[in-house]
């Protein structure tokens, strides 16, 4: 079929296999150029098929030469429908790993479930013995817990209603947006989905099965952002969940003294999830413009390659702040960058969006997530959307 992008609201419902493969190759090429470090040898990447999880898997391979087991929850092609981008990304990653003689298998299923945890443990025992790194990089709208209860996350404040400028990405217009406060049940539900409970469940299960090496490292990803976005993000339902994740880090370290749990606080980037959060897309679009002008903007792979080579695996150990977090948002939150962002925020209107916002860069990142807008790909060509992925366990 000829595959074109079909965007509805904030989601692209198609993905291009050749474009996704190009994306993975580009990321691998960049990571490879950053050099090798004495890091992970056998890694489990939970949420391995897109974004930070995919970048982590690529860096484990390219910067550490690691064997990797991944967990994803993706839909394969079905007749007239393409697969989700994570399927195509994973197919290309498996191919790259095979080229390097590295082990790569991926379990496709719900990472929140006991069944997938059991399957991962079975594969680790059979193929890897033990893992020394566990990356937790899940982003999901809902979670079914061990008792069968379904929890759903929401994007709301936790105090009063909040009104602020927002960017409508459908028409590039600036308008005020009001976000209503969440109920206690909605806050709890968001914490259940996006907090640290499942991260702890994974580490408990892996530890009980004796598939973690001594002094194994586990990394979870978080975002804090600037005060500008606190009401909707860090002081909102998502931020409450992220604070629970931070609390979980301490609990894992206390419960398992021979496991080192750490949180990497990352910079703001375009994702499918972030596009739907009120206020945040405008902040990101301004941030992109300001940081690119300053010369310190990082995309996903640039950030995770720096994490692996300069912060996580160093001769002197982790580089953390006073809270024990690895700060990959260090460039974003410098006073100079934030001061410039605030100036642009105050000045931007619908008429001056392109002057103050990197709209083109925002959309380029968005389309790249789905394998579109790569110069080397001929999108007029007929391609097979249904591809076989060696090494995927359903």
Identify the meaning behind each predicted range.
Residues 29, 34-73, 77:
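Canonical Rossmann dinucleotide-binding motif of NAD(H)/NADP(H)-dependent dehydrogenases/reductases
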Residues 1-36, 186-188:
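Class I SAM-dependent methyltransferase Rossmann-like catalytic core
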Residues 108-120, 196:
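The beta1-alpha1 cofactor-binding region of Rossmann-like NAD(H)/NADP(H)-dependent oxidoreductases
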Residues 105, 119-148:
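A glycine-rich helix->loop->beta "capping" turn
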Residues 152-258, 265-288, 292:
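Catalytic loop of short-chain dehydrogenase/reductase
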Residues 65-104, 110:
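Glycine-rich phosphate-binding loop and adjoining beta1-alpha1-beta2 segment
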Residues 251, 259-264, 281-392:
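C-terminal helical subdomain
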């Amino acid at each position: 079929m000829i595959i074109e992008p079909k965007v509805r609201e904030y989601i692209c419902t198609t993905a291009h296999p050749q474009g996704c493969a190009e994306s993975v190759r580009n990321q691998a090429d960049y990571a490879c150029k950053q050099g090798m470090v004495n890091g992970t040898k056998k890694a489990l990447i939970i949420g391995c098929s897109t974004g930070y999880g995919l970048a982590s898997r690529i860096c484990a391979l390219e910067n550490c030469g690691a064997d990797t087991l991944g967990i994803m929850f993706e839909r394969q092609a079905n007749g007239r429908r393409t697969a989700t981008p994570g399927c195509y990304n994973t197919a290309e990653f498996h191919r790259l790993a095979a080229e390097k003689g590295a082990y790569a298998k991926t379990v496709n299923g719900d990472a929140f479930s006991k069944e997938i945890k059991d399957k991962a443990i079975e594969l680790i025992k059979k193929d890897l013995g033990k893992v020394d790194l566990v990356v937790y990089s899940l982003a999901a709208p809902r979670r079914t817990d061990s008792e069968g209860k379904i929890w759903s996350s929401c994007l709301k404040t936790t105090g009063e209603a909040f009104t602020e400028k927002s960017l409508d990405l459908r028409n590039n217009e600036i308008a005020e947006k009001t976000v209503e406060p969440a109920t206690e049940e909605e806050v709890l539900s968001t914490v259940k989905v996006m907090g640290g409970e499942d991260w702890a469940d994974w580490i408990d299960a892996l530890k009980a099965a004796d598939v973690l090496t001594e002094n194994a490292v586990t990394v979870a990803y978080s975002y804090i952002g600037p005060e500008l976005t606190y009401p909707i993000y860090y002081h909102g339902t998502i931020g409450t969940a992220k604070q629970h994740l931070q609390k979980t880090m301490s609990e894992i370290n206390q419960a398992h003294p021979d496991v080192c749990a750490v949180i990497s606080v990352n910079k703001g980037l375009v994702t499918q999830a972030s596009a739907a959060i009120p206020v945040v897309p405008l902040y990101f679009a301004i941030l992109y413009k300001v940081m690119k002008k300053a010369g310190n903007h990082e995309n996903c792979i640039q950030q995770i390659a720096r994490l692996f080579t300069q912060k996580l695996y160093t001769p002197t150990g982790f580089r953390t702040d006073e809270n024990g977090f690895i700060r990959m948002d260090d460039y974003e939150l410098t006073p100079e960058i934030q001061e410039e962002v605030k100036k642009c925020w105050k000045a931007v209107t619908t008429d001056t969006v392109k002057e103050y916002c990197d709209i083109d860069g925002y959309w380029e990142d968005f389309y790249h997530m789905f394998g579109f807008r790569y110069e080397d790909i001929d999108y007029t060509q007929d391609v097979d959307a249904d591809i076989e992925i060696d090494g995927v366990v359903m």
